[in-house]
């Protein structure tokens, strides 16, 4: 067969497959391009959750997991399952890095400050991991202060009290909640340093916008101010007055992208994104995982990353091919760092472009986000002679997370409008494109149980379609790990033996 060029992977982030209905944004949106693709091109569906992407059964997928599996071309055992298993078999409590952290604090007499996302969403962190870490440290006699980050995004928007109750019921004696802050502030990933500084001031200085007698009061007071869990303003619980010299800090989130900024503020030498004031000298700074090569310079790690050999990008580079990666800020790490198996440096012949995500408080205020700029660069790349292009449209996921159905519909329409230009350019170039998603989200915008907004990912299958493929080709159902082998097959390249995924082409 004639090898198409370019071969393209277009990821519609958070665009799941579901029955038509009043909460299904892709169904309600006017999407003539995608409708035509789904009607006239080979299509199938992919699994994006649970063991098929290296997660525990029933655990919804997410963008980090999705892009890691896509780029690896094999099912990658993810950190959530690894940590869960370690807690279950007891090896977590004997973890070398954790024991060294405890030993350092026993030496200095300092307290351990733990920070984590208090929910069971399992995307960035898990309440059971927090409880296990508290137990390990309290069993060693070290005082514990917990900096609780409320979720409301990977779980229901007003569920924080349930998780705080679970936390306080299971928390080892002698541990106290020091601060309560919504993830909007503590887990930014878009250089909104004004948000991060509010979380920093509460955690490090003990100086929040608000104070409360208890963690429960902090959340109830936030609800009184009409703040949902994600947006709880930094609140200091009475009795906490900041991190002291000789204390230690342990970040329990196991996903890198939304932990990096707050950790830079707390530990990076020469940090200058905002004025932190004098920072207390920490005796130890520990992370559940590796957050970046830069963070490794001043942090230790409980669960270092495992090398993924011969990812899609690495293998394509080894064949002397040129490739291009494209996404706006919110999803840029996913098409670069995560797709390349946790490797930050581009491969030889790998070019990248990142339009900036719009500076709005929440993306329902600008549901088109930077899709027009992504599309313009996408079309330019198709015409530029690359062999492989990987692009991510952030809109369906980022706007889906706001819970605003009308905005999610507009987000889908903005992406479809861009796809129209892309398909035309692809046809002119003689290329082929796989269109799919990394997980579901915007196809379920109303919680079927509560009737309120649904802001989390789903476990729905996602669509996959082949545009401009070889004549007579069909697609079979599969999982995300099958996408890299499919792209390689379209490029006329053998897949490396490490890739255990199977081409979807039939």
Swiss-Prot record:
Pathway membership, UniProt:
Carbohydrate degradation; glycolysis; pyruvate from D-glyceraldehyde 3-phosphate: step 3/5
Record: active site: 63
> Would the keyword Metal-binding turn up in this protein's UniProt record?
yes
List the GO biological process terms: glucose catabolic process; glycolytic process
Entry cofactors: Mn(2+)
* Assembly and oligomerization: Monomer.
Per its record, how is this protein called by name?
Answer: 2,3-bisphosphoglycerate-independent phosphoglycerate mutase
Give the originating organism: Ruegeria sp. (strain TM1040)
- Taxonomic lineage per UniProt? Bacteria, Pseudomonadati, Pseudomonadota, Alphaproteobacteria, Rhodobacterales
């Amino acid at each position: 067969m004639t090898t198409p060029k370019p071969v393209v992977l277009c990821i519609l982030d958070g665009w799941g497959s579901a029955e038509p209905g009043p909460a299904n944004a892709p169904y309600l949106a006017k999407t003539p391009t995608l409708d035509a693709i789904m009607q006239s091109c080979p299509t199938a569906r992919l699994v994006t959750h649970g063991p098929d992407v290296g997660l525990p059964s029933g655990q919804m997928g997410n963008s980090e997991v999705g892009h890691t599996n896509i780029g690896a071309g094999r099912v990658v055992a993810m950190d959530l399952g690894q940590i869960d298993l370690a807690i279950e078999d007891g090896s977590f409590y004997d973890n070398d890095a954790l024991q060294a952290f405890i030993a350092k604090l026993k030496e200095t007499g300092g307290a351990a400050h733990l920070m984590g996302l208090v929910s069971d969403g399992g995307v960035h962190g898990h309440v059971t991991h927090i409880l296990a870490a508290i137990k390990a440290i309290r069993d060693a006699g070290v005082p514990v202060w917990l900096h609780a980050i409320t979720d409301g995004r990977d779980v229901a928007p007003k569920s924080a009290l349930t998780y705080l109750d679970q936390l306080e019921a299971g928390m080892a004696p002698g541990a106290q909640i020091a601060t309560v802050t919504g993830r909007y502030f503590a887990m930014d990933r878009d250089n909104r340093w004004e948000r991060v500084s509010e979380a920093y001031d509460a955690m490090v200085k003990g100086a929040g916008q608000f104070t409360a007698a208890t963690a429960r009061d902090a959340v109830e007071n936030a609800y009184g101010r009409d703040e949902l869990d994600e947006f709880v303003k930094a609140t200091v619980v009475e009795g906490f007055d900041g991190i002291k010299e000789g204390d230690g800090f342990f970040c329990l989130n196991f996903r890198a992208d939304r932990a990096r900024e707050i950790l830079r503020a707390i530990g990076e030498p020469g940090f200058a994104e905002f004025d932190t004031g004098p920072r207390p000298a920490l005796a130890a700074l520990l992370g559940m995982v590796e957050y970046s090569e830069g963070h490794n310079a001043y942090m230790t790690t409980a669960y270092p990353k495992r090398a993924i050999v011969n990812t899609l990008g690495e293998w394509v580079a080894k064949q002397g091919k040129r490739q291009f990666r494209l996404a706006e800020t919110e999803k840029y790490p996913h098409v670069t760092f995560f797709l390349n198996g946790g490797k930050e440096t581009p491969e030889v012949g790998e070019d990248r472009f990142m339009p900036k995500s719009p500076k709005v408080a929440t993306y329902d205020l600008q549901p088109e986000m930077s899709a027009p700029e992504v599309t313009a660069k996408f079309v330019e790349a198709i015409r530029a002679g690359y062999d492989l292009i990987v692009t991510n449209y952030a809109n369906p996921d980022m706007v889906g997370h706001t819970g605003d159905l009308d905005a999610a519909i507009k987000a889908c329409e903005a992406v479809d409008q861009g796809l129209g230009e892309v398909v035309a350019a692809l046809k002119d170039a003689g290329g082929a494109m796989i269109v799919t998603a990394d997980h579901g989200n915007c196809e379920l915008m109303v919680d079927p149980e509560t009737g309120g907004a649904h802001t989390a990912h789903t476990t729905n299958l996602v669509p996959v379609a082949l545009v401009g493929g070889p004549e007579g080709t069909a697609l079979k159902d599969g999982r995300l790990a099958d996408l890299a082998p499919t792209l390689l097959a379209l490029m006329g390249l053998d897949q490396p033996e490490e890739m255990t995924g199977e081409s979807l082409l039939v």
